[in-house]
Amino acid sequence: MPNDRVFLLEALARFIEQARQVVGVRRIAVVGSLTTPKPDLKDADVLVTVGEDVDLGVLAKLGRKLKGAAQIRNLGADVFFANTDGHYIGRTCGFRECHPRVRCSGISCQPGNWLCDDFHVIRLEDELVAAPPIEVWPQIVVRVDLPLDIREVLLMQSQRAPSIMARPIIW
């Protein structure tokens, strides 16, 4: 049985493989504790940059699958969104359907929106959106010291993407 890091990375790799095929997805990056060698993680965080032509419903469904996979191990996952102007716009809504009276932390919750704009809970800084630690699609860009398991699990599956190493990497 893989440890929690590898388990999350494998689930994230499945998400990335499917999300990169969604029309309107411009970039996929890994952020958060998975980009560090921290052994005990609680979640996987991914940042997806989207154009106006994206179907957030498809990405929300993929995000719920990622969260469901993580919950098997009492872990979590967040799929964050940024627009092509480089601004954080929210994260996937955790609910499949929008219901009044359901506890939702979004500011402008609307059926079919699939975007949770709970900026009072979390907001990604523009600097993180502009230069996330690890971009995995459409090209690989690494800006941090790369944990070995990221290289083995995520980057090996993304080999089709061109690589840019912003920092020297010690294999």
Where do the model's predicted regions map?
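Aromatic/basic-lined ligand-recognition segments
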Residues: 47
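Catalytic core of pol beta-like nucleotidyltransferases
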Residues: 1-27, 35-41, 50-171
